[in-house]
Amino acid sequence: TMRRWLGAFVALFGVVVLQYKHIVLAPISLEHVQQDLTGKVVIVTGASSGIGYETALRLATWNATVILAVRNMDKGARAQGVIQQELREKGDRCVGRVEVSHLDLASLQSVRRFANSFEKENRPLHALVLNAGGITNGLHVTEDKLEYNFQANFLGHFLLTNLLLKVLKRSTPSRVVSVSSMMHLLGRLDTDAYGEGGTDALSMRDGLVRYSDTKLMNVVFATELSARLKGTGVVSVSVHPGYVISNLDQHLPPAIKSMATLFRNMVARSTKEGAMTSIIATTHPDWETMNGRYLADDCVMELCEGAARGGWKMWQRRHSAADDDSQRQWLWNTAARLTNLTIHCMAAAQAVWD
């Protein structure tokens, strides 16, 4: 009897997996997105590997000029070389370009240096893809005396976006795409822990918990930014790439690590598939209606195919904190204080919002 029940469970689980892969993981149509990006300039953070690399590759093959904003310049140069080879193989009709530039989001000085350098080049910026993100176990403090995950995943992107708002405004229509995760639904905005950047109060938290918190911050920030940018020609959208094959499993407790790895291998998207949400958010022509949206599976299907396919609805909604004005304001004001945004910078940003 036990074997029969076990067999039935395995069979049922197999059917669920196959249905999920057939319905949710089926290829997304790109028929309705803009595939000729000639003259467009895009910055993709964390573009040396994973979703960021796949996003940059696709945009470059669609004739965009893509800047790989990376912490590790050696890895960035290798990614640049591979993309350039892809472009050469497409022949003279492909005019895409790829550049690599140093950006360490865990250093406020590096973020300022990158933004200042780009602004001095006096060229447009049509899309800023805030893709970089990671996870660390244990408490790591940056040179700015802030918790590493908090700064690298959220705060650095907050500062970068504010410093480039003037350029984005000059380049309208333009967009800011914040790559979040379904894990943001497990996060929370802890005013005590993150009010001073998250050090002592976060020392007892698991890395995966802190990662979820920062992914929530990405969504809340993107939503608040969309409200401030309304009517300017610059839109802000956050995206969930789906359950993507990554190295996050190594940070799980040993008791569930093997099970999570098995489940991931059965139902997870590849990084190429996971990049589709970012690519669609960056290139879909219906940019005005995208402002403030959180794009997960169903939203992407509606944009590209006119109808939702279904899926795990509970993971496709965004956290209620994104709709809470007080929490959005708290996060914005805290980030502005911790990044020491100058009066000049804030005034310039306000000019964009107004």
Q: Each PLM stretch: what is its role?
A:
Residues 9, 22-256, 340-349:
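Rossmann-fold NAD(P)H-dependent dehydrogenase/reductase core
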Residues 101, 282, 318-320:
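Membrane-embedded and extracytoplasmic architecture of multi-pass membrane proteins
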